Amino acid sequence: MVSDLRSRDIAAGGHGAPLASTLDALWLAGPNRRAALNIGGIANITVVGRPGEPVIAYDTGPGNCLLDTVATRARDSAPRHHPAGAPGYDVDGTLAAAGQVDLALPGILLAEPYYAAEPPKSTGRELFTAGYLDAALAERASHPGGAELIPAHADIAATLVELTARTVGAACTRHGITEVVGAGGGMRNPVLVAALRAALDPVPLRRSDELGIPVDAKEAYLTALLGALSWHGLPGVLPGATGSRTPRVLGRFSPGHGPLRMPTPASPVHTLRITEASAARLGTPCTT
């Protein structure tokens, strides 16, 4: 078993994230500049340039984490309208679809210094917490007339969708992207996907399914790939993506009952081809 995949990257000066850039760089390698977008709790992109160009990867900001907070609050504030065990996320974007974007709130949220920081960079739920959202709402309420215009849960959800779409769109525009391939739970939110398409226009947004990786399975493919690379003595991190000074073989191996016998290090991998057979095995990619 291989585990602890981030530590060696951090020891080399990297952020330990986003490790998905390794998969993205092999998967989307080609003549055009494309971006892999993953929307989990945090949204991140990997910019895969033309041959010879460095790979750039970083977290753009909140993905679903703040939306989940608002959806949970909406559920808990109206229990009669939500059955017991209702999920703490915006199912099919229905909450955001019922709201309107608050015009004052995005500017307050975007005052967080992380957005203006240069990549490589990474963030997480420890920054984009409920407290971050509540502080922005409190600041909005302090504006003239703000206390009388407190946004409803649906309006906050719609505004957070706009925040994610705007920050992702700005990042892709900055890097001259010609196509975006999206994965992660956020790609199952039709309201968020529509907002992303509008923010990215005229750059097309495709689902990762179209290129062989189910939107909900990308992390499984990534873990399988990183494990295979480490097993064969190959680096699993791109310095330009995480900030690491040098490429590093990732993780530590825990042997079973017998001694651990590692294979001879393999030749470098340059591309990744997803086959139907590998998809059926839930993430055993074919590398070339």
Feature locations, PLM:
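Phosphate-binding/catalytic loop of phosphoryl-transfer enzymes
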Residues: 2-73, 80-81
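Short helix-capping/linker segments at secondary-structure and domain boundaries
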Residues: 28-34, 74-86, 173-175, 228-238
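Conserved ATP-utilizing enzyme core subdomain
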Residues: 56-165, 169, 177, 246-268
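Non-transmembrane, aqueous-exposed alpha-helical and coiled segments at domain scale
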Residues: 105, 156, 160, 171, ...
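Glycine-rich phosphate-binding/hydrolytic loop that grips phosphoryl groups
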Residues: 162, 209-260
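Glycine-rich phosphate-binding loops at beta-strand->alpha-helix junctions
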Residues: 177-199
